[in-house]
Amino acid sequence: MDRLSRFYTMKKVIFTLCGIVLMCGTSFAWGTRGHEATTKIAEKHLTPKAKKLLDKYLGGRSIVDFASWADEYKKELLFELDFEPSNAPRRLRFPHTFEANADCSVFDGDRRGDEWVKNCVYMAVGYAKDLKANHKNMNNDERFHKIAMLIHWLGDMHCPAHIRYPGDQTSSGYEVMIGDRAVWYHRLWDGILFNWLHPSSQGDAAEAIDTCTPKEIAKIVEGDLYDWGKDAATASRATRKYRDGAQINRKEFVEEFSELLDQQIRNGGYRLAQLFNEIFQ
């Protein structure tokens, strides 16, 4: 059974587990719905050639179907790096984040040995380069894996909770208070805020968020993955004003960061489309 077939077998189990997870109040990165909104926006902005090749490589499925595949793949990724999930160095357990320098530029992940693994931007650069050069000759498993990881990483790298800053390597991994309720701040960005702002389907959310003109989109997709990472880190830095134990007023928080959330979801979608359009030109 190839990786694409295994995914659909696993997905039946995942959907069942998601129902339990949602009842327990937990969430996935950006929120499953947030990732789906990003990919739905991206799908709308693919060139006909890129869409045709993605349809072929994904077995006729939409990229939206694989928006959160990488979250389900984390343990397998560790095995590929020759670690067990239980004994991997802590930094290797977070391959869906990236580290920013003091000026918010993306940490050049190949400078310090295996520390590059925590840098999803660095990994995405390598995957995109490999796909562009070799997608016609790759086996189905390898090609699917690289496409699915790029789909997810472009969403993750735009999420404020997935960016690490000098002196703050927490990825928002601490509790804050909303009223008398303790909430993991990372989770506030990984689904909760999106669900507050967009309680309807991800399709409705994508339509509401995808509001930029062609000229604005052209400006957003300028540069490369490192430029996009710096832009995301710069825009997201203000979210770290809330520290461990901070009291958050829900209404004020929504007013302060609703525009940022929509911007990051939207930018991730436009840039994902641009990346695939360049790879499959």
Task: Report the location of each language-model feature.
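Short, Lys/Arg-enriched N-terminal segments with co-localized hydrophobic residues
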Residues: M1-T9
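N-terminal signal peptide c-region/cleavage motif recognized by signal peptidases
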Residues: C24-T26
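Repetitive helical segments and hydrophobic/amphipathic motifs
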Residues: I20-V21
